Regions:
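Conserved beta-strand segments of alpha/beta enzyme cores
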Residues: 8, 65, 90-92, 188-191
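Generic C-terminal helix-cap and adjacent flexible tail
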Residues: 34-36, 188, 207-209
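Mobile active-site "lid"/loop adjacent to the S-adenosyl-L-methionine
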Residues: 117-148
Length: 209
């Protein structure tokens, strides 16, 4: 099992074990959801893994409707079981590639959050337990580490309503690159956020009107 904010998750082989930095990024998403004007905010967690981020939101904000999307069949076993256990009424898990996220809620979503694979292909993770135990599919994001980030940004642009919030976790050396990526795609209010170690750890952006 893994403890994450106020929840306990089932994890095992084939699923990424959530890190403390992601708890902090999740806090940003929770603040964004709480700021929503809608009575039942809709939240997507893309690249959901164990479901940690989405389920923390679903349990801390019971009026939110949370959908987790995960492409790995191995990981999805944990995603679906954790959703059934922790958010049976206000959460659901979907087995799909991010690019194939269902379109039935396009333009209606309030917040999209993602902790995508973002490690450049040549980099060896600094944490031995990551290199040895976490699945490569959850870690590596292509040559510059941003392949999946680009897809997440495009999918979020169709999911979110104008004024909706996107939050993406990234590596500490990717802050500027992710900012420019989102600005080039037309996102507004693009901001880098530093974690508890004062390292660039995530970006937030608003879908323009």
């Amino acid at each position: 099992v893994a403890h994450f904010r106020n929840i306990t998750l089932e994890v095992g082989k084939g699923v990424f074990v959530p890190r403390p930095e992601t708890e902090w990024v999740t806090g940003l998403a929770i603040d964004a959801v709480k700021a929503c004007a809608t009575a039942e905010p809709i939240v997507f967690d893309l690249c959901a893994g164990s479901g940690a981020i989405g389920l923390a939101i679903a349990t801390e904000i019971p009026n939110a409707q949370v959908i987790g999307v995960e492409k790995s069949a191995d990981a999805f076993g944990y995603t679906s079981r954790n959703y059934e256990k922790l958010a049976p009424t206000n959460g659901r898990a979907i087995l799909a590639d991010v690019a194939d996220t269902p379109n039935d809620l396009d333009g209606k979503v309030d917040v999209v959050i993602s902790n995508p694979p973002y490690i450049p292909a040549q980099m060896v993770p600094i944490y031995p337990e990551v290199a040895l135990h976490d699945p490569g599919l959850a870690l590596y994001g292509g040559e510059d580490g941003l392949d999946v980030v680009r897809v997440v940004a495009d999918v979020a642009a169709r999911l979110l309503h104008p004024g909706g919030t996107l939050i993406i976790e990234h590596a500490d050396m990717q802050g500027e690159a992710v900012r420019h990526l989102l600005l080039d795609k037309g996102w507004t209010q693009v901001r880098t956020h530093q974690d508890f170690n004062s390292r660039d750890r995530s970006v937030s952006a608003i879908r323009s009107h």
